Amino acid sequence: MTGAGTPSQGKKNTTTHTKCRRCGEKSYHTKKKVCSSCGFGKSAKRRDYEWQSKAGE
C-alpha cells in the first residue's frame, strides 16, 4: 500500500514550472507548455479574469 508520506516526497525532484517568456513569472508548465499566469502557449491574448480584481473597482 503506497502512501503520500515522507518517503514519497523524495520522488518530487522534477521541475514543473519555469520562467515564462512573456510575463517573466515562474509559471510556465514545461510539460503542458502553458503559462498559468498569463496564458502563454494557450492564447494570444493575456489571461485575465474579472474575479482577479475587487468588484466595483
Curated annotation (Swiss-Prot):
It comes from the Archaea. A zinc finger (C4-type) spans 20-38. Keywords: Metal-binding, Ribonucleoprotein, Ribosomal protein, RNA-binding, rRNA-binding, Zinc, Zinc-finger. GO terms for molecular function: rRNA binding; structural constituent of ribosome; zinc ion binding. PROSITE patterns: RIBOSOMAL_L37E. Transmembrane segments: none annotated. Gene3D superfamilies: 2.20.25.30. Zn(2+) binds at residues 20, 23, 35, 38. The keyword Membrane does not apply. Belongs to the eukaryotic ribosomal protein eL37 family. Binds to the 23S rRNA. HAMAP family: Ribosomal_eL37. Part of the 50S ribosomal subunit. Interacts weakly with protein L4. NCBIfam families: PRK04179.1. This is Large ribosomal subunit protein eL37. It comes from Haloarcula marismortui (strain ATCC 43049 / DSM 3752 / JCM 8966 / VKM B-1809).
